[in-house]
């Protein structure tokens, strides 16, 4: 709950939580608000864009000729395309979580690196969304319990009247 002291409203308990992210034995801090229900809206806006970038990666090799050797120009163009897609993906993920997720969770390499056939960005999103799912569920249960305690005397009375 917010507290008021000397005309100052303290909403610090609504701030982000600190999570430690381990990458190759190193711990980095990531700040998230895992009870932010508006993430659902952001997911609905960002997922189509991520899928579009996934489609772009399928056509990334279109720049390559059918020759056995790759030219320097092809390497430069391929690198440019990969870099653009990676930057777009990082921006979308940071926007999704309203935090510097890409910097903390993927400080090097590409978001399209794979682990057991799964893109790095998918692993990051799935892992962090699990925090949100769990926390939003807990907060919803607390809210329902609180509402029930405040309305129980009215609903119990209404129930008695309707059963007569």
Would you name each region that the model predicts?
Residues 33, 76, 80, 115:
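Charge-dense, low-complexity intrinsically disordered segments
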Residues 10, 36, 54, 62, ...:
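Acidic-enriched, low-complexity/disordered segments with a strong bias for Aspartate over Glutamate
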Residues 2-74:
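Short N-terminal mixed-charge amphipathic segments
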Residues 4, 16, 28, 42, ...:
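Arginine residue identity/basic-tract feature
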Residues 39-42, 46, 85, 89, ...:
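Alpha-helical structural motif
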Residues 69-88:
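Intrinsically disordered, low-complexity acidic Ser/Thr-rich regulatory segments
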Residues 90-164:
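C-terminal charged interaction modules
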